């Protein structure tokens, strides 16, 4: 089956920035790369990105093909270019389907979120339980009601009819049927058409759809959701002496001691566990010869540091970082902590 990634929207919720599917997330991936990375591609034979011709000024189609091939184990990746904006996501999908004479199953994946899921070639909808999430724009989603056999009885757009919302993954076993239903609902003339409307029309016509629960959902579809995700991730430049251990020096007996500041160590360990994309960089005046000892010491407290920068001057430090609409002001912050105090958590 084919995996379709429709990315031809206006990105109107992200003014003054690149198209949202090309925004860089904290882990260094483009949003479209991150979106694809959670999908089990066992049943996928081809990936199709449906993008606007005008977006070529931001990225070359060849680069998109190569980047998606790398994270899909070499699957065939094709680009379908649109010369004009479409009226809806179904219209974007239909523009590609119209150019294929044969009938085939396909799976639509939104490009502005992440979830873990394995598409199958049947009619299906991926969903998430509302109770599994801390932050979600509940009113912007579509929802499903299901029976005890996990069959969908009703799907509704922007109406909370259950605790199961559609997370942006839709399977169709027939491209021809999708187009027939699309045309019956007004096709290109319908400016308020959603994929959920296609599915609901098919349900009314007696066609079955199954529901499958997805996992580990992350939403970047709105500016608020995107910024909330970005803000959860930090590059933490942390002094060693006086913060994570009681301050020591080469003149101590013995030199460079490792008396733990347990409260601060516990806080940093918990922070990194809760924010797995964050990175800890240790900054210290200790010599390079102590680097291995610092790493081993931190591992005792379940802290894995990204880097240890040694031999710094025993003097003030200044952090300089740029800011932009995709990484807004203030993009850097500083904490001045009383030496050997154990209340680092209060400043975060």
What name fits each language-model region?
Residues 165-233:
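Conserved alpha/beta core of the MobA/IspD/sugar-nucleotide pyrophosphorylase nucleotidyltransferase superfamily
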Residues 91-99, 140-145, 224-229, 317-328:
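Short, surface-exposed amphipathic charged segments that create phosphate/polyanion-binding patches used
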Residues 233-348:
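HAD-like aspartate-dependent phosphatase fold
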Residues 2-5, 13, 24, 29-105:
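Conserved N-terminal catalytic core of the sugar/cofactor nucleotidyltransferase
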Residues 1-17, 231, 235-241:
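N-terminal nucleotide-binding beta1-loop-alpha1 segment
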Residues 54-62, 135-136, 288-294:
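Short, charged/polar "capping" segments at the starts of alpha-helices
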Residues 103-114:
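Short beta-strand-to-loop acidic/aromatic patch adjacent to the donor-nucleotide binding site
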Residues 114-189:
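Conserved core of the sugar-phosphate nucleotidyltransferase
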């Amino acid at each position: 089956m084919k995996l379709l990634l429709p990315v031809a929207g206006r990105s109107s919720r992200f003014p003054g920035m690149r198209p949202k599917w090309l925004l860089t997330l904290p882990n260094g991936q483009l949003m479209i790369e991150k979106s694809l990375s959670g999908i089990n591609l066992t049943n996928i034979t081809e990936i199709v990105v449906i993008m606007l011709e005008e977006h070529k000024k931001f990225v070359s189609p060849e680069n998109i093909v190569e980047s998606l091939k790398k994270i899909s184990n070499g699957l065939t990746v094709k680009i379908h270019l649109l010369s004009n904006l479409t009226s809806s996501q179904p219209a974007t999908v239909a523009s590609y389907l119209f150019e294929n004479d044969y009938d085939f199953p396909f799976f639509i994946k939104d490009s502005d979120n992440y979830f873990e899921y394995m598409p199958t070639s049947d009619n299906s909808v991926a969903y998430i339980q509302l109770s599994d999430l801390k932050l979600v724009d509940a009113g912007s989603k579509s929802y499903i009601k299901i029976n005890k056999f996990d069959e969908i009885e009703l799907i509704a757009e922007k109406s909370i009819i259950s605790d199961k919302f559609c997370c942006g993954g839709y399977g169709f076993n027939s491209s021809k049927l999708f187009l027939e239903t699309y045309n019956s609902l007004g096709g290109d003339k319908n400016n308020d058409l959603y994929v959920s409307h296609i599915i609901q029309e098919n349900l009314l016509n007696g066609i079955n759809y199954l529901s499958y629960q997805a996992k580990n959902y992350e939403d970047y579809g709105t500016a608020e959701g995107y910024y909330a995700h970005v803000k959860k991730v930090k590059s933490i430049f942390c002094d060693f002496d006086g913060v994570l251990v009681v301050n020591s020096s080469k003149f101590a007996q013995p030199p460079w001691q490792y008396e733990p500041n347990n409260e601060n160590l516990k806080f940093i360990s918990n922070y990194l566990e809760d924010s797995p994309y964050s990175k800890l960089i240790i900054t210290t005046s200790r010599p390079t010869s102590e680097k291995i000892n610092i790493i081993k010491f931190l591992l005792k407290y379940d802290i894995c540091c990204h880097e240890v920068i040694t031999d710094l001057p025993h003097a003030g430090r200044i952090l300089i970082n740029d800011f932009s609409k995709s990484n807004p002001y203030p993009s850097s912050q500083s904490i001045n902590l009383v030496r050997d105090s154990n209340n680092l958590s209060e400043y975060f």
